[in-house]
Amino acid sequence: MIMFLSSLVTTFWEALHLKTLVLAVVTFLFLINILRSRHPKNYPPGPWRLPFVGNFFQIDTKQTHLVLQQFVKKYGNVFSLELGQSPVVVVSGLPLIKEMFTHLDQNFVNRFMTPVRERITGKNGLVVSNGQTWKEQRRLALMALRNFGLGKKSLEERIQEETHHLVEAIREEGGQPFNPHLKLINAVSNIICSVTFGERFDYEDCQFQELLQLLDETMHLMGSSAGQLYNGFPCIMKYLPGPHQKIFRNWGKLKLFVSHIVKKHEKDWNPDEPRDFIDAFLIEMQKDPDRTTSFNEENLISTTLDLFLGGTETTSSTLRWALLYMSSYPEIQENVQAEIDRVIGHKRQVSLSDRESMPYTNAVIHEVQRMGNIVPLNSSREVTVDTKFNGFHLPKGTMILTNLTALHRDPKEWATPEVFNPEHFLENGQFKKRESFLPFSMGKRACLGEQLAKSELFIFFSALMQKFTFKPPINEKLSLKFRMGLILSPASYRICAIPRV
């Protein structure tokens, strides 16, 4: 009996100690969370936060930009969030965005390194690198774009040649309903492939088609709930199964694809006659055998992939939006075709020199970019030093999101912000630039492929309007619904391309 009571007391004390220990651990974690969540005086306002998860579950990742629009209405043009353990400040409005990226550009020049990007690229490449690495990679990328086509007749000729392949591929559909996604992404991808890899890929190349599908899936997953969960809670998510693990498997396949092309280049390249970006990078590596710069194997793969991704997804998604809007607004499509018929005719190839004579077509392309809104929150930045901004204190290391959705749908800037209206970019029949139009961002980290993208959009779009009339399938209604990922792309759709000539 005494032994039984002794055992019972011992068990009781052990249970009590265990509960005390658990309570102590939980209390400690809450205190740590409170200390980490404490903000300095004059920190931007924002919605209430849950311990540990912050505002993560208050944001619908399928329409993040629309949720943030509601926060803008409540908290103003500068407000704060916490995504997992990451403090975030969202900035809206043209004056504040200009101040951030021009007058205070040194304080916001760095990219914020998300856990997903850190795992797949480290601090390598062009998109998320900072400091000396970014400067060196950007310099070489700009040189490659300049030397291998940007602003030269050869690039225009490459786009025109690829346009011919695209037109023929669409013509083969015979006016029947089809999804233009893969054809457009293949055409656009071939332009940047000619600059980076020195070759194009046929539309029937099964291996390349599979790669493009991997690319599309990866971009979608990185911006999905699974990708954002990983960014918010990497220490936990890296051990759990789920769609987020596919990001890393897919990225490995993309790296392997580029690695094979690099190895082929290493076998037959001539330093005196560089053919493309990879050759130019190999020359820089040869100059620096001790690897004192960022020109190494890791950056070769990462920067090449960054150029490939950046030069493919954004422009192809814009063209997908363009065909969707033209199919949905036939009267606007007719106006574009009338201008093309008057300036170019039915047979002559579209040229960049035609752009000045085609203000309406140019306005339509810009309106597609405004309404398509493919980069609704810009690429994230990081505060490099403690900064006073618009009366608020922004601590070093804070993630910054610039709200391009609010800018491109601002009723103070646009007559009909929620309606597709090319007149936004026209004045007295002439094309009008708009200061509040920033699809390529601004400042030192603006998109370095802006001129390439503009050239592609004009030639591809004008040529497709010249050769086809795009319509919804019979008895089908097109939807302008979007799919959220790293970029905002249209939901899958089918259209009919009716030959005009």
From Swiss-Prot:
It is found in: Endoplasmic reticulum membrane; Microsome membrane. This is Cytochrome P450 2J5. It catalyses: an organic molecule + reduced [NADPH--hemoprotein reductase] + O2 = an alcohol + oxidized [NADPH--hemoprotein reductase] + H2O + H(+). Belongs to the cytochrome P450 family. Heme binds at residue 447. One of its GO terms (molecular function) is heme binding. Keywords: Endoplasmic reticulum, Heme, Iron, Membrane, Metal-binding, Microsome, Monooxygenase, Oxidoreductase. InterPro entries: Cyt_P450, Cyt_P450_CS, Cyt_P450_E_grp-I, Cyt_P450_E_grp-I_CYP2J-like, Cyt_P450_sf, Cytochrome_P450_fam2. Its cofactor is heme. SUPFAM superfamilies: Cytochrome P450 (SSF48264).
